[in-house]
C-alpha cells in the first residue's frame, strides 16, 4: 500500500462529492445541503467520549499520511478505502498541514497547526465528499464557517 499512487486525493474527494450531490435535487442542494450559516461551535479539542480506552501508537513514518498504511481503516459503507484515506491525507497535509491524529473504529480526526482562512466552502465540500455523515443536523455554510475557527477536523462513518 505504501507504493500506491497518492497523487489523486483531490480527485477522489471531487468524485465522492459528485456522488453525494447526485442524491439531491438542485433545490434540496441549495436549501438543505448548502443552507445558511448557523454559527456552529468550532472544534479545537478531540471528540473522545469519556471512558474510552486510548492507545498511543508510534507509527514508523516520516510522512504523516502513511499512517493509513499501518492502521487499516475504512472500506465499509461509505467510508473510503485505506488507500483513499492515505491519498486524501497526503493532499490535505500538503495543502493545509492537516495530520490524522485520532483514529477509532468509525472516526478520524485531523489536527491542523492553525485554522484555515479565506474561502472555506471548497474545503467544506471536500469534507462532505470524504464523509457525508458529517452534515447530520448541519449544512455546508455552517461547516465552512466552522472551518475558519477550528484546528480539528472531525469525520465519522456509520
Predicted segments with their positions:
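Short amphipathic alpha-helix segments
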Residues: 79-94
